[in-house]
Amino acid sequence: MAAAWREGDDLLLRLYIQPKASRDSIVGLHGEELKVAITAPPIDGKANAHLSKYLAKLCKVAKGSVVVEKGELGRHKQVRILQPSQIPAEIAALIE
C-alpha cells in the first residue's frame, strides 16, 4: 500500500501524525505511511483541525477540501485532499 496516491482529481494520503512537535513539517516515510509533525496537541480535535489547515496550506486548497476519512481519533490517518492546486515535492515523489 502506498503512502500517497491519486484517485481521480483527488489526492489520498496515509499519514502517521506526531502531535506537539516544535514545528509543522513533513518528516518523511514512517513504514508505509507519510509522517507529519504538527504543533497542535491531540486534545478535543485540535490536532485534526491543525492538520487540515496545514495540508490545505501546502496544497493550496480550502480547509474544507481536506477530509479525514479514517483515523479521526488516532495517529494513523487516511486523508483525502479534494482537487489540490499544488502537490508538495515530498508528497509528489511518493505518488504511485
Curated annotation (Swiss-Prot):
One Pfam short name: DUF167
Gene3D superfamilies: YggU-like (3.30.1200.10)
An example Gene Ontology CC term for this record: cytoplasm
InterPro entries xref list: DUF167 (IPR003746), YggU-like_sf (IPR036591)
Top-level taxon of the source organism: Bacteria
The family this protein is said to belong to: Belongs to the UPF0235 family.
PANTHER family in UniProt: UPF0235 PROTEIN C15ORF40
SMART domains given in the database record: DUF167
Protein known as: UPF0235 protein VC_0458
HAMAP family: UPF0235
SUPFAM superfamilies: YggU-like
Organism: Vibrio cholerae serotype O1 (strain ATCC 39315 / El Tor Inaba N16961)
